[in-house]
A protein has these predicted regions:
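Extracytoplasmic gate region of multi-pass secondary transporters
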Residues: 20-21, 195-239, 243-246
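Interfacial helix-cap and linker-helix signal at transmembrane-aqueous boundaries
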Residues: 27-28, 59-60, 143-150, 223-224, ...
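Helix-breaking motifs and short loop linkers at transmembrane-helix boundaries and internal kinks
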Residues: 32, 64, 85-90, 119, ...
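Helix-to-loop junctions at the C-terminal end of transmembrane segments
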Residues: 52-64, 248-260, 344
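Cytoplasmic helix-loop-helix junction between adjacent transmembrane helices
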Residues: 95-131
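Helix-loop-helix hairpin linking two adjacent transmembrane segments in secondary transporters
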Residues: 120, 127-174
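C-terminal transmembrane helical hairpin of 12-TM major facilitator-type secondary transporters
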Residues: 259-306
Length: 377
């Protein structure tokens, strides 16, 4: 039941992770938003993710995972019911900040729960559960394009309803309280977490999350700027990127029992750099679909496998350690959102240049992987 609870939470997080990129074109048209304002909205969501992930780690270690998951799902439900009633740019920024808070709590709580439940097969369990992130992320743009006719209001209410159902399930599911060895004690923070490895992994996720969520948030707008119809652009995001992540996380499961986790992240970094660079060079929808799909496969195992490395390296205060590196990831999203929005300015066609931040970050990730591998020896 605990793994199933984590799966439901990650599925909901997958749906909201793909949501901003899915509804951004319609929001931009309705409220006349520029790419620079889009960057501010993405920054607000990232700021919420940062603050939540930073604060929730000690809460999870001190009070248990259930408190965090219920709190995060409550935030998400409220925001999604309120978003269709937003009146303009400022209210959207506030609501996306709160959505980030809820998402940050949920993703940290769910991954920490799985890490504790499956200590002997942590990498496989985290990739299995995060497979459903890909399923949720696939569902959002696919439903918007093919079932709701790009009606973002219906999309918000549908995901909000699913979140309420998930919230009820978590509230009714018994979950273990904090363990004695992982319980947050302020005086233990420095010796438990003050290792260079944690900061190297944090910097790695700083780069990675900016890449992955950058595609979720900006790809559709970029494709539309190239002249690709919105429905086709949404399907490239869902059938291409989201489905690639879904298949990639399913395919990596048997490999993880034979290959070290650091080798998986190194391979993913190289593949990310190549596929995202080529993805941004093409203007043909069919080629873009294939390259976006391959980029999704490349990125699929990176995030959960990195969390597994943290879980193995920090058996004490695991929730706090995972919360820290995830916070670093959301910080990367905040920084990259500002950079991409600044480079693009008021012209969506400049996103082609701005999004080159993604393959550049992947190259730096590979260099960090080499340092992390040395630290693990």
């Amino acid at each position: 039941m605990l793994i199933f609870a984590a799966i439901l939470a990650i599925f909901i997080y997958g749906m909201i992770a793909a949501m901003l990129g899915t509804i951004l074109p319609d929001l931009s048209d309705r409220f006349h938003l520029s790419p620079s304002q889009n960057g501010t909205i993405a920054f607000a969501q990232a700021l919420g993710l940062i603050l939540a992930s930073l604060a929730v780690g000690p809460l999870l270690d001190d009070e248990g995972k259930k408190v965090g998951l219920v709190l995060g799902l409550t935030f998400i439900s409220i925001v999604l019911f309120a978003l269709p009633r937003s009146s303009g740019f400022k209210s959207i920024v506030i609501l996306l900040f709160l959505l980030g808070v809820g998402g940050g709590i949920v993703v940290t709580g769910a991954n920490s729960l799985v890490s504790d439940v499956s200590e002997n097969h942590r990498a496989m369990a985290l990739n299995l559960v995060n497979l459903f992130f890909g399923l949720g992320a696939f569902a959002t743009p696919f439903i918007a394009a093919n079932l709701f006719g790009r009606n973002w209001v219906r999309l918000c209410y549908t995901i909000a309803t699913l979140t309420v159902v998930t919230l009820a399930f978590h509230a009714a599911t018994p979950m273990p309280g904090p363990t004695g060895s992982g319980r947050f004690v302020l005086t233990d923070v420095a010796p438990a977490l003050g290792r260079p490895l944690l900061f190297m992994v944090g910097l790695f996720l700083f780069l990675y999350v900016g890449c992955e969520v950058g595609i979720w948030n900006w790809l559709v707008r970029h494709l539309i700027a190239l002249g690709i119809p919105e429905k086709k652009a949404l399907n490239i995001l869902s059938v291409g990127f989201a489905l690639g992540m879904l298949i990639g996380r399913a395919g990596i499961l048997p490999i993880l029992s034979h290959v070290p986790a650091i080798t998986v992240t190194m391979t993913g970094s190289v593949a990310m750099a190549i596929t995202t660079f080529l993805m941004l060079r093409t203007t043909r929808p069919a080629v873009a679909l294939v390259l976006v799909f391959l980029a999704g496969i490349s990125m699929a195992p990176v995030f959960p496998t990195t969390l597994a490395i943290v879980g193995d390296a920090f058996p004490r205060m695991t929730g706090t350690a995972i919360g820290f590196v995830i916070t670093c990831g959301w910080t990367g999203l905040a920084v990259s959102s500002r950079i991409i929005g600044f480079i693009a300015g008021g012209d969506p066609r400049r996103l082609k240049k701005a999004l080159m931040v993604i393959p550049g970050s992947a190259v730096l990730m590979f260099a960090l992987d080499l340092a992390i591998r040395s630290a693990l020896r």
